[in-house]
């Protein structure tokens, strides 16, 4: 009991102090709630700086009549704009409905027209088919009657034969009369006039020619002279100088240049610049002469490096010369044409066919072929070789030999190597001996002056041929 009394007295004496502490905590909590954000958890929100700022703006807006008027005008315009947009939506909806209705009407009309056309065509075709069937039935009945009559009247064979021919004539006449109806005859007439089979046949022939035939390209190894000119040639050599038409810009530039040349300032400047230009040209010539005639090893080293890096190569200069003579020259087409010519040239060379060699080879190659041929014949040697395959045709070198360009082509062939004597007996190789032979051809360009007046572009001839090696396969 004494302890309880002591605790009660202590609480009663310290009660004012607890009340003061509680009051301070409440004040601190209120002060914190003023600085909480809008999404805070407090239920009571006091006025802040932003609310006072908004109140000031509202007061100024209410006190300013012009601002209120502009706000009202903006509201009215927004309402008008809303009305216009609604009206536009209604109009677009109406126009789309009209378009859909028109499209449906056109579609229904087209369907009805198509049905009418198809029904009329079906009726016409059915009528024509019925007419043809009736004509066939009539012909069959007449044939059956003629057959029965010929069986019963075997004694009168000649008369029955004449009657059957007459009946056949009547059958074809009736069939022709059935076909002479306006509907069927019109159909056959249209088919005859259209001639679809002829058109299709012509188209197929054109496609076959395009697929089978090679595209027309200029020949580099053959010269085909044009057909002779049958018209009259003019012998007049008069020349008339005609002035070329200038554009407006060129005319203005010419007039401006003439005015500038006539001005005294331009004349004075040109008179002053002429000695300067002449002096600079003299200095440049002196420097060039010193550079070219210098004995300094450093200068020689620089010149060698310049020639090494900046000088045009032999192949480039050769190709440039070829294109200057023949602008339509193409190296891939040239290699393809060489591949086509290899077989006839090698066969003609082994057989001694001079006429074929004249088309593709130079005089030196033909003379070499005839000399080798006569030498082998005197010794009784006969080559029975046969060319099997040609591969790996490529252009290896292009260079100049004097004034004429030279192209060296490489290729390899597979040949049957067989050497016989005068009696036809095999001396070397055999019919089963196959060799791979590596060839090199030197093609030289022939000038147009050597070909004649009709030649426009130069052509190429086989200037030299050699075998680099032979490898036995079988």
From Swiss-Prot:
InterPro entries: NTF2-like_dom_sf (IPR032710), Tim44-like (IPR039544), Tim44-like_dom (IPR007379)
One Pfam family matching this protein: Tim44
Primary subcellular site in the record, as a coarse category: mitochondrion
Keywords: Coiled coil, Membrane, Mitochondrion, Mitochondrion inner membrane, Transit peptide
Biased composition (Basic and acidic residues): 132-143
Biological process, per Gene Ontology: protein targeting to mitochondrion
Coiled-coil region: 68-88
Residue numbers spanned by region Disordered: 132-165
Keyword Mitochondrion applies: yes
Assembly, per entry: Probable component of the PAM complex at least composed of a mitochondrial HSP70 protein, TIMM44 and TIMM14. The complex interacts with the TIMM23 component of the TIM17:23 complex.
Function: Essential component of the PAM complex, a complex required for the translocation of transit peptide-containing proteins from the inner membrane into the mitochondrial matrix in an ATP-dependent manner. Recruits mitochondrial HSP70 to drive protein translocation into the matrix using ATP as an energy source.
PANTHER family documented for this protein: MITOCHONDRIAL IMPORT INNER MEMBRANE TRANSLOCASE SUBUNIT TIM44 (PTHR10721:SF1)
Descriptive protein name: Mitochondrial import inner membrane translocase subunit TIM44-1
Organism annotation: Arabidopsis thaliana (Mouse-ear cress)
């Amino acid at each position: 009991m004494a302890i309880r009394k002591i605790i009660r007295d202590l609480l009663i004496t310290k009660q004012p102090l607890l009340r003061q502490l509680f009051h301070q905590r409440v004040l601190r909590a209120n002060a914190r709630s003023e600085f909480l954000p809008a999404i805070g958890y407090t239920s009571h929100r006091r006025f802040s700086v932003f609310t006072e700022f908004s109140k000031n703006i509202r007061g100024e807006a209410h006190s300013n009549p012009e601002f209120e008027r502009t706000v009202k005008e903006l509201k009215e315009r927004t309402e008008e704009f809303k009305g216009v947009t609604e009206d536009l939506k209604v109009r677009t909806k109406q126009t789309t409905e009209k378009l859909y209705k028109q499209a449906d009407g056109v579609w229904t009309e087209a369907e009805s027209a198509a049905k009418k056309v198809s029904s009329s065509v079906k009726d016409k075709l059915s009528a024509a088919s019925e007419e043809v069937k009736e004509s066939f039935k009539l012909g069959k009945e007449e044939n059956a009657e003629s057959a029965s009559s010929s069986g019963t009247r075997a004694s009168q064979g000649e008369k029955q034969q004449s009657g059957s021919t007459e009946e056949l004539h009547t059958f074809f006449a009736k069939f022709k009369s059935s076909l002479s109806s306006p509907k069927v005859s019109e159909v056959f007439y249209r088919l005859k006039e259209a001639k679809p089979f002829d058109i299709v046949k012509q188209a197929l022939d054109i496609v076959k020619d395009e697929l089978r035939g090679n595209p027309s390209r200029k020949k580099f190894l053959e010269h085909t002279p044009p057909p002779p000119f049958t018209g009259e040639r003019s012998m007049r050599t008069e020349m008339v100088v005609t002035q070329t038409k200038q554009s407006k810009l060129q005319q203005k530039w010419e007039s401006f240049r003439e005015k500038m040349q006539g001005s005294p300032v331009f004349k004075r400047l040109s008179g002053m610049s002429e000695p300067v230009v002449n002096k600079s040209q003299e200095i440049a010539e002196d420097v060039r002469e010193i550079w070219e005639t210098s004995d300094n090893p450093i200068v020689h080293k620089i010149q060698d490096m310049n020639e090494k890096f900046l000088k045009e190569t032999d192949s480039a200069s050769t190709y440039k010369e070829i294109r200057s003579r023949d602008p339509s020259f193409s190296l891939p087409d040239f290699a393809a044409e060489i591949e086509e010519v290899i077989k006839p040239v090698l066969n003609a060379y082994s057989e001694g066919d001079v006429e074929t060699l004249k088309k593709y080879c130079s005089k030196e190659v033909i003379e070499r072929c005839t000399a080798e041929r006569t030498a082998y014949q005197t010794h009784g040697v006969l080559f029975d070789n046969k060319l099997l395959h040609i591969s790996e045709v490529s252009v290896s070198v292009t260079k100049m030999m004097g004034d004429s360009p030279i192209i060296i082509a490489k290729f390899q062939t597979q040949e049957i190597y067989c050497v016989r004597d005068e009696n036809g007996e095999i001396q070397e190789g055999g019919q089963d001996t196959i060799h791979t032979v590596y060839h090199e051809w030197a093609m030289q360009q022939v000038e147009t002056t050597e070909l004649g007046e009709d030649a426009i572009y130069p052509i190429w001839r086989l200037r030299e041929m050699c075998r680099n090696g032979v490898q036995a396969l079988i």
